[in-house]
């Protein structure tokens, strides 16, 4: 196949544009929106046959929507490209000794090379996620990791659509959606990331960008069972800046409303929508109090066992607020 012959540089060369709806606050207007990440459609034409083989032939009818999870608070730790065998041994030891609230689904996403080490040494109920996966079955795709390989290592989840994959690697909405569909069809849960750039927020395009990203997932997914949506404003990731509780809640409400109108009311009410973007032990409680924030996707703070435990246990703030 010609999939791997297209360079990442060529994927991010020429801007495409799309006609869509812009939201400023909650008011709607129509405009022509230029994509913030310029990509070439040829990349997706090259993989189109692979998409059809790996996803479309296995899709359930769009009218069939399976309900998502348990409704528990959900906290994921994205370790990104960090750690050594020694530091991860210490981090896992801290997690094993931490007291974590029972009413929380806890997931950690180590780098690929440490998944087996983490899986074999965790003693509690913490589940394992991958940070990415290939769009279909394994084969001649140098450097990629298949969902089947992740399952073989014991991964229950995979993070897809993270802003660093979108804006650094150049992955497009359609490509991400197809990866999510394949993972779900293989029985791996998806943490589906969405979020806007700073210039998009300042231009009043926050909702529009998030809706486009959601639509790409909705168009591809066989169901919303085992899907967690993670809203991560790009301007807040790793910057120390964090959306205020009100800002985060506003977007979470809008995301849930979009799911209600475009997927189903049941999916909207069942799907957990979590927040990510410089979440730490100091701000997690106030964020957790927001009605539509169902948990967190944590970056840097997840590399510190005690602080990550504090974030997991912020579910108590939600219980008090309720």
From Swiss-Prot:
Pathway: Carbohydrate biosynthesis; Calvin cycle
Keyword terms of this UniProt record: Calvin cycle, Chloroplast, Isomerase, Plastid, Transit peptide
Enzyme class of the recorded protein, top EC level: isomerase
Catalytic activity, reaction form: D-glyceraldehyde 3-phosphate = dihydroxyacetone phosphate
Entries under Gene3D superfamilies matching the protein: Aldolase class I (3.20.20.70)
UniProt main location, coarse: plastid
GO biological process, one term: gluconeogenesis
Active site per database record: 162 (electrophile), 232 (proton acceptor)
GO cellular component, one term: cytosol
InterPro entries reported for this sequence: Aldolase_TIM, TIM_sf, TrioseP_Isoase_bac/euk, Triosephosphate_isomerase, Triosephosphate_isomerase_AS
Superkingdom of origin: Eukaryota
EC number: 5.3.1.1
Transit peptide, UniProt annotation: 1-67
Residues binding substrate: 78, 80
MF terms (GO), sorted A to Z: triose-phosphate isomerase activity
Listed PROSITE patterns: TIM_1 (PS00171), TIM_2 (PS51440)
Location(s) in or outside the cell: Plastid, Chloroplast
Pfam families xrefs: TIM (PF00121)
Subunit structure: Homodimer.
Annotated HAMAP family: TIM_B
Family to which the UniProt record says this protein belongs: Belongs to the triosephosphate isomerase family.
More details: In plants, there are two types of TPIS, cytosolic and plastid.
Listed name of the protein: Triosephosphate isomerase, chloroplastic
Source organism (scientific name): Spinacia oleracea (Spinach)
